[in-house]
Structure formats: C-alpha cells, structure tokens
Regions:
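Alpha-helical recognition segments enriched in aromatics with Gly/Pro capping
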Residues: 1-143, 149-156
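C-terminal low-complexity, glycine/proline- and small-hydrophobic-enriched intrinsically disordered tails
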Residues: 162-197
C-alpha cells in the first residue's frame, strides 16, 4: 500500500489518529523501522562509526536497508567499520520468549551461580553462534572452574596463554578456553611441573 514495488522498504508510514505521528510534507506519519535506526545512529554516533550490531535476524532486511539509506543520504560507502551479529541464546533448546515464560536474566543466573560461572558459560560459545542456556551448561562450567582453581599454581600462571590473538580472531573465546583446557590437562598429567625440573 505504501510501496511502489514489493521489494521497496518504507521510509515514512502514515499514522492513524491514535498512533504516534508528526506532520510532514507527505502527511501525518512516522518514520519506517529502518529509518528510525539510521536517524538515531547518525544523531548519537555520527554519519560513520566503528561498530554496529544486533541479532543475526537483523542482517536482512533491517541492517541492509539501514546501510542503503544511510549511505545514500550521506553520500558515503560505509555506515560502520564492523558489523557484529550475535547468535541466539535458547533455553533448553527452545527460543527464549516472554510469552513462553522461559526467560532467564543474568541476575537470576547469578543468584544460583557465581558471576565467573555465568561469564564462562557465556564465553563458551562464540558470540555469533547459538548458545543453549540450561542448568547442565552452568553446572559443567562450575565444575571446570573448580578444577582450574584446584590445580592453579605459579607454574600454571607462567604458562597461561595470551588471549589477545584469539580475541582479534573475531572474538574467538571458545578457542582461547580450549587452550586453557589443554593447559590444565598438561598440569593434571604433570607435564608442566616436569618442564620446570
């Protein structure tokens, strides 16, 4: 109804009397979804900024349309230097949803598990991959941390790998955590102490 072609996206939508709206040369209305974000990002971040992100479901059409209109409006080739799209967190393999009632907040998780356990659980999956949030995951991470703390020593500390390269590799936190697992396996087998002798 507001588009010339089905593939067009709406820049301005007419508003009904009870809906939010403003006077414009095109009649009373409001910005389309993509335009709202373009205007807010330009107002608060400028015409070009470093990082933009959101869920994987926003890549198309939302972010592509936001790029198209922002770049056209500002006569630029780029809106943001980096685009970061996160995977979804499910709960027991089901999409978290208020309507289903299966949302768990960080605060709720932190009431049951330490902040370190919650952080390790979140970092166990790369940010753009899905993560199934459940008690098994948190219990597993709690056991991992307990084991690491039990085995920790000055010898282990001197062998802890630098995480910088893995973080530069698209925030590859699972790769770094796997290196920590390998380190503590060596510690458990006595390989680290043998190196020091």
């Amino acid at each position: 109804r507001f588009k010339k072609d089905p593939l067009d996206f709406v820049l301005w939508k007419p508003s009904l009397d009870k809906e939010p709206g403003w006077k414009s040369p095109w009649g009373r209305g409001r910005p389309g979804w993509h335009l709202e974000c373009s205007v807010m990002s330009e107002k608060y971040l400028g015409k070009h900024f470093d990082i933009h992100g959101g869920g994987l479901d926003l890549i198309f059409p939302h972010h592509e349309n936001e790029i198209a209109q922002s770049c056209a409006n500002n006569n630029s080739k780029k809106l943001a230097n980096y685009w970061i799209h996160n995977g979804f967190i499910t709960y027991n393999k089901q999409k978290m949803s208020k309507s289903v009632g299966n949302i768990t907040t960080i605060k709720e998780a932190s009431n049951k598990y330490s902040g370190q356990v919650v952080r390790l659980a979140l970092l166990s999956s790369q940010y753009k991959q899905p993560l199934d949030w459940n008690d098994d995951l948190l219990l597993e991470q709690s056991k991992v941390l307990d084991k690491w703390y039990t085995m920790y020593s000055s010898e282990v500390n001197s062998e802890i790998p630098n995480c910088f390269q893995d973080l530069l590799d698209d925030l590859n936190t699972p790769l770094y955590i796997s290196k920590l697992h390998d380190l503590f396996k060596k510690c458990q087998s006595g390989d680290i102490n043998k190196k020091k002798e």
